[in-house]
Amino acid sequence: MNSTVVNQGLRTKGGGSLKKVLVFIESLDGGGAEAILRNTVSVIDKSKFDITVVTETDNERYTDEVRSYVHHRSFTKRNGSVLNEIVNKVIIKYSLLASEKAVRNNLIKGDYDVEIAFCEGYATKVIGNSGRKNCKKIAWVHTDVINHPWSEAIHGGAENERKCYENFDAIVCVSETMKASFVKKYGMAEKVHVVYNVIDDEETRIKSEESVNLDLPRPIFALAGRLTQVKGYDRLVRICAKLRDMGYDFSVAVLGKGEEEENIKKLISENSLDERIKLFGFQENPHKFIKNSDVFVCSSYAEGYSTAVSEAVILGVPVITTECSGMGEIFGGEDCGIICENSDEALLEAMKKLLDEPSLLEFYKEGEKKRAESFSMASRIRAVEDFIENI
């Protein structure tokens, strides 16, 4: 007799067996890869997959939401007590010093049909070197391993990272340009694939309609993302100082937080840009800020497949971005803005161009209307499901 069992949002239809899937990611505390994982597990077919997401810690930005969709476990639990903090520190220390096999067996635990390392670095190192042979392993790569090889250090060098990736059955890059970089550096072309990020285009549009008063003079350039060195906020400040000195009127809204925040504040102050550049910090809903700006700027030195740029295109906000992995694919041949050379000078000229020719904004918005249709969440989640099913 057929029956339906509901468990933490997972629905099992009698007569069929679910594919058990482990997804390991260090954190759910904001960030592009974390948001993409949240989007993915929110809509993936629960009648096909029994998914468990494992992280190092709990009580992070997306923890409760992810837990409402799928199973979630973490190495540590937070309850605020002194003893709890001591225990958590011991567990994290163990996770860093123990072998990958020990971490997999003693902290992640469980048996799965498919094991996914959802981000390069530590997650990839643990899943790739776990020694497990009775499952399929997938490594998800969200960065350009040539232009931003940050994860090499986690493995102790590029050669160790290459050997780790050889232990995977499949490697997923989130853009064609990232795939090209990966294959150029590490080879393994036969098992490197492209699966585009799952972006909630409908939620992006709905949230963008919420009211917000930026209280800034126009035109407004908006930036969104973690305040880290690779995002290039430092050079954006220097460029704004030059534009100001050239006599241009504009303002900048920066959304996000991160380790570079104090340095950026210092740069803003040193360049007397406090009235021009406003840091709004982390925002639960960045979409309403972006929608109410005139231009979205990505000043990054390197990207994988930018969720923020994709969302700007969905919202019809013209984009200026440095040349990074995935940008051409996001534009998809449409005139969505300017992709400039990845240099301070080129970014300056791109911003200057739109200040000189504001009529271009309407032209780019028309291109974005055509392109926005390609970000369908339904089609992208089907691609993810098909990939996991057929691995």
Per-range role (PLM):
Residues T177, V198:
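Carbohydrate-associated surface elements
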Residues E100-I108, V114-N134:
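An aromatic- and histidine-rich active-site surface loop
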Residues P318-T321:
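Short hydrophobic beta-strand element within catalytic cores of glycosyltransferases
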Residues K265-G281:
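Nucleotide-activated donor-binding/catalytic signature segment of Leloir-type glycosyltransferases, i.e.
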Residues G121-T124, I138-I154, A170:
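A short, histidine- and acid-enriched strand-loop-helix "catalytic/donor-clamping" loop
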Residues G31-N39, P219-K242, Y248, V252, ...:
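A conserved mid-protein helix/loop that constitutes part of the nucleotide-sugar donor-binding site
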Residues F282, Y301:
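Aromatic "clamp/platform" in nucleotide-sugar-dependent glycosyltransferases that forms part
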Residues G333-D344, K353-P358:
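Conserved acidic donor-binding segment of nucleotide-sugar-dependent glycosyltransferases
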